[in-house]
């Protein structure tokens, strides 16, 4: 009988597809099912309904109950041997317990616990729970519970080198509006390097947060004020001499997906420091800064010098140890199953 897995996770980015591909290469029959946040399904109608609702909690609970019923029905019809859940904040304990009766259930928290209060207690209802930040593993240990450190990863099918001109000096992709740290850092770079071509994708000034601020926002040539797809992101990285990676405020000790995706694309990365980043790249594979002075010096060096040797060493490491293929094999080892 062929091995089978049900993958459940949020629809954003390409993580469901990357996990599906990794399991498929290991000989698994794969069924994937994605959910939306903050309400499922996040259709135009539901988005409007949720926004104007006077009972958002009630509407959310109804959405959660409906999705959990759907998942139980899907589980019954597909009969997987493994249920692999990414984040899973929409799933309730009864659903997890139900699936655990007949399958191995593992959760991979792809965000930190501060962002996933609905997933915090999943550890009590699954076979294994993995965290992408060591401090979340430590939190569970303090509670007398066992969680496992499983960093994020690169989807190598999406992020890979392209033979195109590097016509952009510095680029960044990520949410900006809700991160003062990112805004402050990027604004400082724009001021310091006014003659360089700098391109930033991500919501910088949403129109719904003030139409006049949106119309009159500064540096429109830098801040594109929109999101781009994973494939477009890979192309942008390949066009860039330097790609910035600035972790959000809540990420204190770990690596976000961009860490590995930038490297996978074959671009030179400059990243803010934290203990895990410094441990992972201690031989100069990427530029790591602790303050703006170090950041500016790294940018100057990245623009003036050939960084291909650093890039090649970093990419070799990611392909060997930090792809989705590697992570799924680690999950199977935790479950004591052959990969």
Feature locations, PLM:
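Active-site proximal beta-strand in glycosyltransferases
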Residues: 98-112
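Nucleotide-sugar donor-binding catalytic core of glycosyltransferases
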Residues: 2-53, 63-70, 78, 87-93, ...
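Conserved acidic donor-binding segment of nucleotide-sugar-dependent glycosyltransferases
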Residues: 284-292, 301-305
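Short acidic loop-to-helix transition motifs that present clustered carboxylates
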Residues: 112-115, 155
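A charged, aromatic-enriched C-terminal amphipathic alpha-helix characteristic of glycosyltransferases
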Residues: 304-335
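Proline-aspartate-enriched helix->loop->beta-strand connector
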Residues: 75, 79-83
């Amino acid at each position: 009988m062929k091995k089978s897995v049900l993958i459940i996770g949020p629809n954003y980015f390409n993580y469901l597809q990357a996990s599906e591909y990794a399991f498929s290469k290991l000989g698994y029959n794969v069924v994937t099912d994605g959910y939306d946040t903050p309400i499922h399904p996040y259709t135009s109608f539901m988005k409007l309904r949720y926004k104007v609702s006077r009972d958002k909690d009630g509407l959310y609970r109804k959405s959660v109950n409906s999705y959990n019923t759907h998942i139980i029905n899907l589980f019954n019809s597909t009969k997987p041997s493994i249920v692999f859940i990414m984040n899973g904040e929409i799933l309730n304990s009864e659903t997890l317990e139900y699936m655990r009766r007949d399958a191995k259930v593992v959760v991979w928290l792809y965000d930190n616990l501060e962002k996933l209060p609905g997933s915090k207690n999943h550890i009590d209802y699954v076979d294994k729970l993995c965290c992408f930040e060591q401090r979340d593993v430590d939190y569970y240990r303090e509670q007398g519970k066992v969680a496992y450190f499983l960093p994020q990863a690169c989807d190598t099918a999406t992020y890979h080198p392209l033979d195109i001109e590097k016509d952009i000096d510095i680029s960044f992709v990520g949410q900006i509006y809700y991160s003062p740290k990112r805004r402050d850092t990027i604004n400082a770079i724009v001021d310091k390097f006014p003659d360089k071509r700098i391109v930033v994708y991500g919501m910088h000034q949403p129109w719904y947060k003030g139409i006049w601020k949106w119309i009159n926002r500064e540096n429109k040539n830098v801040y594109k004020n929109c999101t781009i797809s994973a494939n477009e992101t890979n192309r942008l990285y390949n066009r860039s001499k330097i790609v910035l990676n600035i972790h959000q405020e809540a990420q204190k000790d770990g690596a976000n997906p961009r860490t590995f995706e930038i490297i996978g694309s074959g671009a030179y990365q400059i990243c803010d420091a934290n203990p895990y980043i410094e441990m992972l790249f201690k031989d100069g594979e990427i530029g790591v800064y602790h303050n703006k002075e170090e950041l500016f010096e790294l940018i100057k060096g990245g623009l003036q010098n050939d960084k291909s040797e650093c890039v090649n060493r970093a990419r070799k490491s990611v392909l060997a140890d930090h792809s989705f293929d590697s992570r799924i094999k680690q999950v199977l080892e935790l479950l004591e199953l052959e990969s």
